[in-house]
């Protein structure tokens, strides 16, 4: 009986790049929907702007490099990068902010290093840090959840604010005019109050903490968690990085909270506020910029979880997701070098 002999690789998969990226984008939909419900149409407008600029920028770069434009645009990587950046910035941020960030992510961070698969840093997070450092006022001007706002940001007001069509419609028109709290996220509010000598208990009596974590933010994180679990089910990502981030952050926050609950934020607050779940399942799991081996992924994820806690607790930025991811990206090659699997035929020693 004759057997067919074929060269390697002998294991094939139907999960091509465009399929993986498409599934990631689809799994973002629950989080985007809940975020839009609580924070208005601005998220959708930012998303549309980011995707448009990302595709135009990628097409322009491919044209300059004499590469296949269609093949690059259809891998859907620009779609994911644009989506992650769009949901990370304030919904009513001016239009030029998302344009600058998207151009930086696609042209500088991604294509300047050679395109998909060659970038060292996560493009969306690198762009986020650039915007945060360069335009701190615009990047920290979050609107309050619509369930608490005095003025509802309908589509007309949203367009006026983002595109600055009318000076009377600025982001501060939609602030939360209760208890002196303005456009601050729960993490921002806690960070500011703790620096002023208030306890966490005193700070969480404010209206923005009408829920156990913060109005709206708990459900936004839950929605991204659901999307992340779907990706695990579809085997788009593996559990190591996400699990290590969540577990490490929970353990570190629990230790601090047990030591001094009046000065350290609770573990539930850390897990379900800010961009924790978005980072754990959609950002840190980027296969290009993360560690590759199972042990390496665990170390990589634990490092991100630890950095998120340390920067949130002792650093100058309330939500440390972007900084933690970029620092871990820098260490990914180092991690891979020291935890790489032993090759077959490797001699242990005498």
Swiss-Prot record:
Source taxon at top rank: Bacteria
FMN phosphoryl threonine found at: 185
Lipid bilayer topology: Multi-pass membrane protein
Required co-factors: FMN
Record-linked InterPro entries: NqrB/RnfD, RnfD_bac
Family: Belongs to the NqrB/RnfD family.
The protein, known as: Ion-translocating oxidoreductase complex subunit D
Organism from which the protein derives: Shewanella frigidimarina (strain NCIMB 400)
């Amino acid at each position: 009986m004759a057997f067919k002999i074929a060269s390697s690789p002998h294991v094939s998969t139907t999960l091509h790049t465009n399929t993986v990226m498409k599934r990631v984008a689809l799994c973002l939909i629950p989080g985007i929907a809940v975020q839009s419900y609580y924070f208005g149409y601005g998220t959708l407008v930012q998303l549309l702007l980011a995707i448009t600029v990302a595709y135009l920028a990628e097409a322009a770069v491919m044209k300059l490099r004499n590469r296949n434009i269609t093949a690059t645009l259809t891998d859907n990587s620009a779609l994911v990068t644009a989506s992650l950046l769009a949901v990370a910035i304030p919904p009513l941020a001016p239009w030029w902010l998302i344009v600058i960030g998207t151009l930086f992510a696609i042209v500088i961070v991604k294509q300047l290093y050679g395109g998909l698969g060659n970038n060292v840093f996560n493009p969306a997070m690198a762009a986020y840090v650039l915007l945060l450092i360069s335009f701190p006022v615009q990047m920290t001007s979050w609107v309050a959840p619509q369930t608490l706002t005095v003025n509802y940001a309908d589509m007309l007001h949203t367009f006026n604010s983002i595109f600055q069509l009318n000076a009377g419609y600025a982001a501060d028109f939609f602030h939360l005019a209760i208890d002196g709290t303005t456009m601050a996220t729960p993490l921002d509010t806690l960070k500011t109050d703790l620096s002023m000598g208030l306890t966490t208990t005193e700070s969480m009596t404010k209206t923005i903490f009408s829920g156990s974590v913060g109005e709206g933010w708990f459900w936004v994180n839950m929605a991204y968690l659901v999307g992340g679990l779907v990706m695990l089910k579809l085997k788009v990502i593996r559990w190591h990085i996400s699990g290590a981030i969540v577990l490490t952050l929970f353990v570190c926050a629990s230790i601090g909270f047990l030591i001094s609950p009046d000065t350290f934020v609770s573990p539930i607050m850390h897990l379900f506020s800010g961009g924790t779940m978005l980072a754990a399942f959609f950002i840190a799991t980027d296969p290009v910029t993360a560690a590759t081996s199972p042990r390496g992924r665990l170390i990589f994820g634990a490092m991100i979880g630890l950095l998120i806690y340390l920067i949130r607790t002792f650093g100058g930025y309330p939500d440390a997701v972007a900084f933690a991811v970029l620092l871990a990206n820098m260490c990914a090659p180092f991690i891979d070098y020291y935890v790489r699997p032993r090759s077959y035929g490797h001699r242990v020693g005498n």
